[in-house]
Amino acid sequence: KKLDSVEQRQLFSAVGQAKLINRYYELFREHGIPVGQVLTTKESFGTRRHYLNQRNCMMVMLENGVIPIVNENDTISVTELMFTDNDELSGMIASMMDMQALIILSNIDGIYNGSPSTPGTQVIREVEQGKDLSDYIQTEKSGFGRGGMLTKTTIARKVADEGITVIIANGKKDHILVDCLLYTSPSPR
């Protein structure tokens, strides 16, 4: 049977989600860290009851030493109500869980004061509250996601306005999460 685009997305999501969570399970297991899967939709943030239920689920997991692996439930998400991308989802989760920090990984080192490919361009180390970054944000997206740096900075600003530290870092660098947690990373805040 020939599938339409929605059916294709649902099929690929259902198959891919199983592979993805198994991969996370194996990676974390190597370090003795238990993980659990939380599939969500944008609608889960729409009512207080669903919001609190989701928050409580993740709190119980964390209190019991289980790391929640949160992902959009693409198999049932309605296109019009989907998250922009995982950056939006991570920002909403960081706010929901009242986190101290949100680390957004990218394929570049952060926000640059020009095009990252231009010689002499540098990463902006720290963004001041309310600073206009529109001249610096590249609108291209990588071939892997729906968002891009524009979405990352939009989400980062919203989350930072709530008092949560936001770091945009290059996820391709070895030990970047440890570096970010130790604040030794060259990534901007």
Spell out what each predicted region is.
Residues 169-178, 185:
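Structured C-terminal cap/extension of enzyme domains
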Residues 183-189:
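Conserved small/polar residues in nucleotide/adenosyl-binding loops
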Residues 1-165, 171-172:
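Nucleotide/pyrophosphate-binding catalytic subdomain
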Residues 65, 179-182:
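Short loop/turn hinge sites at secondary-structure boundaries
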